[in-house]
From Swiss-Prot:
Binds 1 zinc ion per subunit. This is Peptide-N(4)-(N-acetyl-beta-glucosaminyl)asparagine amidase. Specifically deglycosylates the denatured form of N-linked glycoproteins in the cytoplasm and assists their proteasome-mediated degradation. Cleaves the beta-aspartyl-glucosamine (GlcNAc) of the glycan and the amide side chain of Asn, converting Asn to Asp. Prefers proteins containing high-mannose over those bearing complex type oligosaccharides. Can recognize misfolded proteins in the endoplasmic reticulum that are exported to the cytosol to be destroyed and deglycosylate them, while it has no activity toward native proteins. It comes from Arabidopsis thaliana (Mouse-ear cress). GO terms for cellular component: cytosol.
Length: 721
């Protein structure tokens, strides 16, 4: 062990770092992060004496004590000073632009006349409705809480986290609440006719009725049916109690109602008002220790650059409003502060901050000292975060879409449309993701003893399918039951065709084990109760896989005249599936179309490569770098868009870390005729052992109609070891 003291220079500051060399470079990076707030993955550390880049191979004991921290985005160490100078010049221009904008504000400030506060104060009253127990109770009753809790746990399990903390569970539940709300609430362009349901045409505004005013509908839009003489009213309700009932509206109604749901489930939440005509929600994440952007209209979370970068919005004021106060959060949503500042002409910056502080003090007047101190600390931390965010580099690898909610022509008119192809968040710089899919392999393996028992007993194919459908029905009953108390009954009778043959019960052992289920014979001996064995999340993540696999197995067996031992081979029987490795792709769609979705065994999920139509790749690395000889693989088409199916591809293997690749299989002009169609391929390359496998997809079915590639599943099968 060598104790070192480094002096790290970053921008205009120097930091002393005490460090033990045996701790490794990773610890040094985190020490530097604690001082500079530059994340470890964004650090380039340079020894100033010889201008060498510090890497894992560097001798930290003999390294120069003077280090320089530079941007990870620089092309080389040699041009770092030039890049810094360029950044300094750009910063100077931005600061000058800010000064000019502030100077301009002085001339327009006289026009304020309380306009800014007048726009904010009504929302301060509105957010207090979210604290009403009656409104919260009404909202709570409409949410399938157990279902969302289960989905939250499964989402964490897919990342390998089977024992999450409360903060992690809360954050995962919040995201599931967002996705549920996106599907439950309805966007209204023109409401359908109240009488016949046909299209309507706007006729202007009408006078609100007393019943509409009772729920804050001061504005009522009037529409005329194109097919009948009926007039349809569209009250713009502001009371979330009514919105919980109607479940429809535009961005104002969506954000208003969703923020109530967030408060109902205990999240620190605030309504975000964008003065360029949009509204959304923020919630505080205790696991991430920061406020999270949530847009219920778009179903997008933690993507604050969505509006400036994706929608091309020219932001000016973005104000957060909650029961605890009012805050200017514009800097979270822009990387062009000097441009935004030039558009902030309602009042001066100092007057704006004074006004927000006044509103905040009003809301916090009755708080106890401890609560007030916590809020003030969080406020300070947020302001520091906003300043860091303003000057941090934008992630160029993430592509943000134009607006998706609302009529196409309306979005185009507002210049928020984007493009037809770019309709979701995607990334061209994917992380290495771990495949949590050992349960998929175990489920596939568990069908062999079941089928073997059927063959040994001479069961006809028709009867085999009947028995498999009984197993499937039990799994359906379990999946539909509350996830904490899953239980189903299997009736036993060797002679009754409508009951499960008792002699086949032992053959189910491996399947139940793969699903984290247990069986217990009832006291009458005529049925078996199947229930969870305590590993609730493992059962939840595995049940959909087993159901999809059983559906496929029943469909495959229907093609057989007879079932014998020779039938129990690939592709009917899928043994020795490779699992638990890691995967890296050329691109992916966030959050649902990530690379590991191709290995999760679930038909409805898929890997999407937004720019993969004319070429993309996905690499699989085995667990612990184990060498495998691949003997077969399968690909499955996704749920929709046949034009995105892969048509030509090459499968390669490597045993030297990817320096060289051996072609294992090559396919051209492949066509998936159906959705969820599985195609099986045997590998003829003899005896090649590899721990890296790469698919290079060369083209999709119709490269002229899409830029995307999508794939429902990839399964790799190794030789028996």
């Amino acid at each position: 062990m060598v104790a070192r003291k480094f002096v790290v220079r970053h921008e205009d500051s120097s930091f002393d770092v005490d460090y033990n060399t045996e701790d490794g470079l990773e610890v040094l990076r985190f020490l530097i992060f604690s001082l500079t707030l530059v994340p470890p993955e964004e650090q380039k550390i340079v020894a100033e004496d010889d201008n060498r880049l510090v890497s894992d191979e560097s001798d930290l004991a003999s390294l120069s004590e003077r280090l320089r921290l530079v941007s990870v985005g620089e092309d080389s160490v040699e041009n770092s000073d030039a890049e810094m100078l360029k950044s300094d010049e750009e910063l100077a221009r931005m600061l000058q632009a800010e000064e000019d904008a502030i100077m301009f504000q002085q001339f327009v400030a006289a026009r304020d006349n309380g306009e800014f506060e007048g726009r904010i104060r009504p929302y301060v009253s509105q957010v207090l409705m979210y604290e009403d127990p009656v409104r919260q109770d009404a909202a709570r009753k409409t949410v399938p809480k157990d279902e969302l809790e289960e989905k939250a746990l499964v989402s964490l399990a897919k990342e390998g986290n089977f024992e999450p903390s409360k903060e992690e569970r809360d954050y995962a539940f919040l995201l599931q609440l967002l996705f549920w709300f996106k599907k439950s609430f309805r966007w209204v362009n023109e409401p359908p006719c109240d009488f016949c349901g046909n299209k309507t045409i706007g006729q202007g505004m009408g006078n609100p009725l007393t019943s509409e005013l009772a729920y804050g509908a001061n504005r009522v839009e009037i529409y005329r049916c194109t097919m009948c003489p009926t007039t349809t009213r569209f009250p713009r309700y502001n009371d979330p109690l009514k919105l919980v009932e109607t479940k429809k509206g535009r961005c104002g109604e969506w954000a208003n109602c969703f923020t109530l749901y967030c408060r109902t489930f205990g999240y620190d939440s605030r309504l975000i008002m964008d003065f360029t005509d949009h509204v959304w929600t923020e919630c505080y994440s205790h696991s991430l220790k920061r406020w999270i952007h949530l847009d219920p209209c778009e179903g997008v979370y933690d993507k604050p650059m969505l509006y400036e970068k994706g929608w091309n919005k020219k932001l000016n004021y973005v104000i957060a409003i909650s029961k605890d106060g009012v805050c200017d959060v514009t800097k979270r949503y822009t990387k062009k502060w000097h441009e935004v500042l030039s558009r902030r002409t309602l009042t001066t910056e100092s007057s704006l901050q004074d006004g927000l502080r006044t509103l905040t003090r009003e809301r916090r007047r009755s708080l106890m000292f401890e609560s007030l101190s916590k809020l003030e600390l969080r406020d300070r931390n947020e302001q520091e975060e906003l300043e860091r965010n303003l000057h941090s580099a934008d992630n160029a690898s993430v592509s943000l879409p134009g607006r998706q909610s609302g009529d196409r022509e309306w979005r185009i008119m507002r210049s928020e449309f984007g493009s037809d192809e770019n309709s979701s968040v995607s990334s061209s710089s994917c992380p290495v993701r771990k495949c949590v899919d050992d349960h998929v392999t175990n489920i596939y393996d568990s069908f062999l003893p079941i089928l073997t028992q059927f063959v040994e007993d001479g069961l006809p194919v028709a009867r085999t399918n009947e028995v498999l459908k009984m197993i499937k029905q039990v799994l359906v009953d379990l999946k539909n039951a509350p996830y904490k108390t899953r239980k189903a009954r299997l009736t036993l009778d060797s002679d009754n065709s409508s009951s499960f043959p008792e002699q086949f019960l032992p053959a189910l052992g491996d399947l139940l084990l793969a699903l984290s289920l247990k069986s217990e014979r009832d006291t009458n001996g005529k049925s078996v109760t199947i229930s969870v064995d305590g590993k609730l999340t493992k059962t939840a993540i595995a049940l959909p896989v087993a159901l999809d696999a059983l559906r496929e197995l029943v469909a495959d067996l229907s093609k057989y005249q007879n079932l014998n031992k020779d039938s129990l081979s690939f592709p009917l029987v899928k043994q020795n599936r490779v699992c638990s490795g890691s995967v890296l792709a050329s691109g992916e769609e966030l959050p649902s179309g990530i690379a590991t979705a191709a290995f999760d065994g679930i038909q409805e999920s898929k890997w999407e490569e937004p720019n993969g139509a004319k070429g993309c790749w996905i690499v699989y690395k085995t667990l612990y770098n184990q060498m495998h000889q691949l003997i077969a693989y399968e690909l499955m088409s996704a749920n929709d868009a046949p034009e995105r199916d892969p048509k030509d591809w090459i499968l390669e293997g490597s045993n030297d870390g990817g320096s060289t690749w051996c072609v294992l299989d090559k396919q051209t002009s492949q066509v998936f005729e159906e959705r969820f169609q599985r195609k099986s391929y045997k590998i003829t390359t003899p005896g090649f052992q590899a721990n890296l496998f790469r698919f290079r997809f060369l083209s999709v079915r119709d490269v002229n109609s899409t830029s995307r590639l999508q794939l429902g599943s990839i399964d790799l099968y190794r030789s028996h070891q």
